[in-house]
Amino acid sequence: METIKTIAIINDPKVTLGSLSNSDIEEKYAWDVDWESLSEHHEYIILGGHMGAYEIETYPYLLKEKEWLNKVINNGTKVFGICLGAQLIADSMGGTAFLSEEIEFGFKELEFHKETEIFSGLKNSKVFLWHRDTFTLPPSAELIASTKYPQIFTIRNSIAVQFHPEVTETLFKDWYDSDISRKELVDYDVSSTLNYLITNACLLYTSPSPRD
């Protein structure tokens, strides 16, 4: 019987596993992976990136990634998509990723539309957002939480989150220092807020899938 592994798909070298890092998680780069070799029996984390899910001419590997996501999600594989990963899941399953009217950046509370044990630890807390793109939900998806835009949805055995549960203080500082225009938007105690998020991110990652 094949051993189930967790494989992280990295779409951007600056966006890593962060708080979800684990020696048992195998990492693969989206632009260099043989999609046909990836077993549907494994579990996958699809990480974020600076590009849009629709930028397939500039990043042609995204088209192959979306085709693969459609196949494995429809076959019941467990996938956890983060930010760009959520947009790719939405786009691959019948939704549409697109450039939104505004940038969502900083720490914001979510509005929950459904009670779920998996996400209960995120209620009344702030999650870290950093994106300009958003998406429409696939027809078979279930919206769990949102801001003005969708933030958490489930589809078959997969979970997609638009925010960054993987963010650590180091990752935050790397992203923050690379874009001075964002600095005036953040006035929170970064360290204490991120510690709370990291705890809940790890709980989210180790929770059963929505259909278990």
Residue spans for each PLM region:
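Catalytic nucleophile loop
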Residues: V72-T96
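C-terminal helical/coil "lid" or tail adjacent to the Rossmann-like core of SAM-dependent
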Residues: R156, Q162, V167-T193
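Short, charged N-terminal beta->alpha structural module
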Residues: K5-D24
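Pocket-forming structural segment of enzyme catalytic cores
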Residues: D91-F172
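Flexible gly/pro-rich beta->alpha loop and the following alpha-helix that scaffold active-site loops
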Residues: I25-F80
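Cofactor-binding loop segments of dinucleotide-utilizing enzymes, especially the Rossmann-like FAD-
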Residues: I9-N11, A30, L84
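An accessory alpha-helical subdomain
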Residues: T193-L204
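Conserved small/polar residues in nucleotide/adenosyl-binding loops
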Residues: Y205-D212
